[in-house]
């Protein structure tokens, strides 16, 4: 584990010129402030540095704006993109008057959720492994002005470009709709770009595994090794940052919107999770699919609280355009071994050490600190209250008769519904003071502004359906 002294030595050894302090806002966006290296000493790791929190949506008012960034030396890494040698350090956000974690800091909430596992005696380590998908386009144009609303996307990979005239000719080899998983180049047109993305992540300290094209045209995924909950959330922020940066360098644009394209697969973020205690996997046992009773109760908690969790794991109005039947989206709240149509899947493994739950409804717009923490708190509530998840569903849920489908609960159908469920079902999040009413209320208020803007804005499809009526 790196200490402040280790970081200061690394600054000297690498001839670092600047130190970039980063933190995550409630919406999940990485924010930063850059210091000349002369401002970085042991004191900043002990006392932090002040900043104005009033400009961060969902945080403090202007009359109480002072906040404290506390650098976490464990996260120090060199940014591979900046012209001047720059060290990046992820920060916690503290209340300057008390030195306590700020109750609305997503990273602080994630750390408190991890601590709950220990305080309950359930385990001592939580491992998380997200699989975040994304799109890369050559060009994106959008307008949301009152008299000009719409968007346009383009990528040389899109099947709509089979007859487009290109300088040097059109060479074909397009990825067909839902046909991107996963032919070799030249159909897979950004192999080298993904390799650079993965390499940049590795340079920033992320343990990387693989990369590949995804199902939709222009859709991709990079693989990371699992890690402990808060560190994995840190790594997911690096993941998004590297993808945006490398795409930009290539003259392209990456997006983590769950459903930018109608009629093709959306981008999900399946999240694998497990708990360990004294070096042993808590989720391994002799019940269904070689799971422990504790794991089944964990799944029961996820299913019971899924609609409230959606507010964090699927935090955009666009998220619910992905969560519809027919595009491999896990809308049904059921669990199964190997069945990818269930929202909670138990991946097959012969090793007890690899026993885990894969929650499939989250998407990559989720704030990773809040999304991971909310799922963990739901699972812990399931363990505490021995919530029965019911029988496993081992048949293809996509092909069930309508009458059977009606008996299976589903995730939320809109962000408004998710926020309403969060408002009603919040007690499990507040256990141990992990989340509190102040944060939940402020988050609902922040997200409702997005809902209301979306609901009040006329949509191009409405003109298509109703203009001449």
UniProtKB/Swiss-Prot annotation:
<keyword id="KW-0460">Magnesium</keyword>
<feature type="binding site">
    <location>
        <position position="209"/>
    </location>
    <ligand>
        <name>ATP</name>
    </ligand>
</feature>
<dbReference type="GO" id="GO:0046872">
    <property type="term" value="F:metal ion binding"/>
</dbReference>
<feature type="binding site">
    <location>
        <begin position="265"/>
        <end position="266"/>
    </location>
    <ligand>
        <name>L-glutamate</name>
    </ligand>
</feature>
<dbReference type="InterPro" id="IPR004809">
    <property type="entry name" value="Gln_synth_I"/>
</dbReference>
<keyword id="KW-0436">Ligase</keyword>
<dbReference type="GO" id="GO:0005737">
    <property type="term" value="C:cytoplasm"/>
</dbReference>
<dbReference type="InterPro" id="IPR027302">
    <property type="entry name" value="Gln_synth_N_conserv_site"/>
</dbReference>
<feature type="binding site">
    <location>
        <position position="131"/>
    </location>
    <ligand>
        <name>Mg(2+) 1</name>
    </ligand>
</feature>
<keyword id="KW-0067">ATP-binding</keyword>
<keyword id="KW-0535">Nitrogen fixation</keyword>
<protein>
    <recommendedName>
        <fullName>Glutamine synthetase</fullName>
        <ecNumber>6.3.1.2</ecNumber>
    </recommendedName>
</protein>
<feature type="binding site">
    <location>
        <position position="328"/>
    </location>
    <ligand>
        <name>L-glutamate</name>
    </ligand>
</feature>
<dbReference type="InterPro" id="IPR008147">
    <property type="entry name" value="Gln_synt_N"/>
</dbReference>
<dbReference type="InterPro" id="IPR014746">
    <property type="entry name" value="Gln_synth/guanido_kin_cat_dom"/>
</dbReference>
<feature type="binding site">
    <location>
        <position position="270"/>
    </location>
    <ligand>
        <name>Mg(2+) 1</name>
    </ligand>
</feature>
<dbReference type="GO" id="GO:0005524">
    <property type="term" value="F:ATP binding"/>
</dbReference>
<feature type="binding site">
    <location>
        <position position="353"/>
    </location>
    <ligand>
        <name>ATP</name>
    </ligand>
</feature>
<feature type="binding site">
    <location>
        <position position="133"/>
    </location>
    <ligand>
        <name>Mg(2+) 2</name>
    </ligand>
</feature>
<feature type="binding site">
    <location>
        <position position="274"/>
    </location>
    <ligand>
        <name>ATP</name>
    </ligand>
</feature>
<feature type="binding site">
    <location>
        <position position="221"/>
    </location>
    <ligand>
        <name>Mg(2+) 2</name>
    </ligand>
</feature>
<feature type="modified residue" description="O-AMP-tyrosine">
    <location>
        <position position="398"/>
    </location>
</feature>
<feature type="binding site">
    <location>
        <position position="340"/>
    </location>
    <ligand>
        <name>L-glutamate</name>
    </ligand>
</feature>
<dbReference type="InterPro" id="IPR001637">
    <property type="entry name" value="Gln_synth_I_adenylation_site"/>
</dbReference>
<feature type="domain" description="GS catalytic">
    <location>
        <begin position="106"/>
        <end position="469"/>
    </location>
</feature>
<dbReference type="GO" id="GO:0019740">
    <property type="term" value="P:nitrogen utilization"/>
</dbReference>
<keyword id="KW-0963">Cytoplasm</keyword>
<feature type="binding site">
    <location>
        <position position="358"/>
    </location>
    <ligand>
        <name>Mg(2+) 1</name>
    </ligand>
</feature>
<feature type="binding site">
    <location>
        <position position="340"/>
    </location>
    <ligand>
        <name>ATP</name>
    </ligand>
</feature>
<dbReference type="Pfam" id="PF00120">
    <property type="entry name" value="Gln-synt_C"/>
</dbReference>
<dbReference type="GO" id="GO:0016020">
    <property type="term" value="C:membrane"/>
</dbReference>
<feature type="binding site">
    <location>
        <position position="322"/>
    </location>
    <ligand>
        <name>L-glutamate</name>
    </ligand>
</feature>
<feature type="binding site">
    <location>
        <position position="345"/>
    </location>
    <ligand>
        <name>ATP</name>
    </ligand>
</feature>
<feature type="domain" description="GS beta-grasp">
    <location>
        <begin position="14"/>
        <end position="98"/>
    </location>
</feature>
<dbReference type="GO" id="GO:0006542">
    <property type="term" value="P:glutamine biosynthetic process"/>
</dbReference>
<keyword id="KW-0547">Nucleotide-binding</keyword>
<feature type="binding site">
    <location>
        <position position="360"/>
    </location>
    <ligand>
        <name>L-glutamate</name>
    </ligand>
</feature>
<dbReference type="GO" id="GO:0009399">
    <property type="term" value="P:nitrogen fixation"/>
</dbReference>
<feature type="binding site">
    <location>
        <begin position="272"/>
        <end position="274"/>
    </location>
    <ligand>
        <name>ATP</name>
    </ligand>
</feature>
<dbReference type="InterPro" id="IPR027303">
    <property type="entry name" value="Gln_synth_gly_rich_site"/>
</dbReference>
<dbReference type="InterPro" id="IPR008146">
    <property type="entry name" value="Gln_synth_cat_dom"/>
</dbReference>
<dbReference type="InterPro" id="IPR036651">
    <property type="entry name" value="Gln_synt_N_sf"/>
</dbReference>
